[in-house]
From Swiss-Prot:
GO terms for cellular component: host cell nucleus; viral capsid. This is Triplex capsid protein 1. It comes from Human herpesvirus 2 (strain HG52) (HHV-2). The keyword Magnesium does not apply. InterPro entries: Herpes_1. HAMAP family: HSV_TRX1. Residues 1-29 are annotated as: Disordered. The gene is TRX1.
Amino acid sequence: MKTKPLPTAPMAWAESAVETTTSPRELAGHAPLRRVLRPPIARRDGPVLLGDRAPRRTASTMWLLGIDPAESSPGTRATRDDTEQAVDKILRGARRAGGLTVPGAPRYHLTRQVTLTDLCQPNAEPAGALLLALRHPTDLPHLARHRAPPGRQTERLAEAWGQLLEASALGSGRAESGCARAGLVSFNFLVAACAAAYDARDAAEAVRAHITTNYGGTRAGARLDRFSECLRAMVHTHVFPHEVMRFFGGLVSWVTQDELASVTAVCSGPQEATHTGHPGRPRSAVTIPACAFVDLDAELCLGGPWGAFLYLVFTYRQCRDQELCCVYVVKSQLPPRGLEAALERLFGRLRITNTIHGAEDMTPPPPNRNVDFPLAVPAASSQSPRCSASQVTNPQFVDRLYRWQPDLRGRPTARTCTYAAFAELGVMPDDSPRCLHRTERFGAVGVPVVILEGVVWRAAGWRACA
């Protein structure tokens, strides 16, 4: 049986490959380029080219790389020129796309802000602590006048913030315009301000003791009390804290001077992807106070080898002279569209309380003023204008109908019944997310914390539950 001899002329190994006369050994110092230029089905040493004969170049490859084969003369020199031109185009495209990166390297984004250390003292916080950005305080009294129900004391919020400014840094903590600066709020400081609202009272008091001790003694304690009063005044005037706070990032590094701090945090991507700059703890895992952490899957008896979502949750109690605000970090396998029903089950008592007492101390409407829709009176009168179903879209007939304009003051609304609000913080993509419960020492104070490993930040917007 005769067999055909192998052809001596070189053959094209792949349509999308760029063939060159340069041997792989000459490209030993250019491994990335060799991976780009060598086709996936080529042998390790590539095709052997005999003599000075140029390889065959496919039109599709040259067209995609922007090379005109007609402009190149045949031969080894023309082939090398085409190869150099192709490599140059590939490298320029890689530089425009952000450079050659290591395959599989995590992508993350850092953010930085200079802030006063009144509500966020990075020297006293662990790497990986959660930070929130606060809206400018001068906006809050204006929001209170627009959102507070009739009869609520809108001046209560302005007075509470004024008292907080008196205990802030740099004397009064006011800028040249006479108002406070916008800044950052540490999650631990927020938890300490809401310590009275947590069920785990001992763990919450430990967080408060940590803030009072490591933030500046009695001055920090006064700020905690006055910030807590600000939160209650915000609930009273329906300027809910979740509407003026947003996720900033996980703490990585900081530089402090006097009462100012330049804070760097991971706002997107893996928290553990960047270096903290501390030899003893080069990587930062997310650290949450144990009293403010809720494993929703364990509470609802859910389980399985899946990843989990992380949510930031605010809860409110709207009861006259008993307003409360509380903040949690919730871990759950439920996606955002299914979390509201789970929160309703978990905080159902707050929902009932707000529905019953949320409309208290509001100015009611005058008696007997369009309380009910007067359907019986127009229906009984033959002189009342009517409109058939086919004429509903015609303004000529619709405008003649009776207009009912009830007075909704003092009636329950979605805002008076709001008991919680949540926003997605990120995910824990591991099949078995690790949540380590331990006691961390902050100076002389031991605080029960939960350390979350493998958190990937991807913050989303707020959703209110009513």
